[in-house]
């Protein structure tokens, strides 16, 4: 049983998946930093100096009466909030990650297409009956039409 587990654990697919998960976690940190520190501040400036991470709806006041200066102040007062600004940041992060993954997969598929390009086919289609015919054939074996 231990040998079977060892064979499973060191099999190529499991190791590849583990490496992918670790790289994905690191990539997520990079994207979150990109969104929170690079993308959102200019958008906030364009919208009048707004910080999206501080957008929230107050559901219930805390020990200190509202209004609160920021989401952090509301949370420290024990207020119950709906923090939709953090959700907006998460949605933007998701869109960036999916777009980068789309571009990555598209590039990889383009490279694979060049590698997987098949040589000229050994078969062509008969123009009369549409059946497959050898490229070397002078007549179609199905309809006996002469081929050029």
UniProtKB/Swiss-Prot annotation:
It comes from the Bacteria. It is a multi-pass membrane protein. GO terms for cellular component: plasma membrane. It is found in: Cell inner membrane. The keyword Lipid biosynthesis does not apply. The keyword Transferase does not apply. Its main location: membrane. InterPro entries: Mechanosensitive_channel_CS, MS_channel, MSC/AndL, MscL_channel. GO terms for molecular function: mechanosensitive monoatomic ion channel activity. Pfam families: MscL. Gene3D superfamilies: Large-conductance mechanosensitive channel, MscL, domain 1. The chain crosses the membrane at residues 14-34, 85-105. Keywords: Cell inner membrane, Cell membrane, Ion channel, Ion transport, Membrane, Transmembrane, Transmembrane helix, Transport. Belongs to the MscL family. Channel that opens in response to stretch forces in the membrane lipid bilayer. May participate in the regulation of osmotic pressure changes within the cell. Homopentamer. This is Large-conductance mechanosensitive channel. The lineage of its organism: Bacteria, Pseudomonadati, Chlorobiota, Chlorobiia, Chlorobiales.
């Amino acid at each position: 049983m231990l040998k079977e587990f060892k064979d499973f654990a060191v099999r190529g697919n499991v190791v590849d998946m583990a490496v992918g998960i670790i790289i994905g976690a690191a990539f997520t940190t990079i994207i979150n930093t990109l969104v929170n520190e690079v993308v959102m501040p200019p958008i906030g400036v364009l919208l009048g100096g707004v910080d999206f991470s501080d957008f929230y709806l107050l559901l219930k006041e805390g020990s200190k009466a509202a209004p609160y200066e920021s989401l952090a102040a509301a949370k420290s007062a024990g207020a119950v909030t709906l923090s939709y600004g953090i959700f907006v940041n998460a949605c933007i992060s998701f869109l960036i990650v999916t777009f980068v993954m789309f571009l990555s997969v598209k590039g990889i598929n383009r490279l694979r297409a060049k590698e997987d390009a098949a040589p000229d086919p050994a078969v062509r289609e008969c123009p009369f009956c549409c059946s497959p015919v050898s490229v070397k054939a002078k007549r179609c074996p199905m309809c006996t039409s002469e081929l050029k």
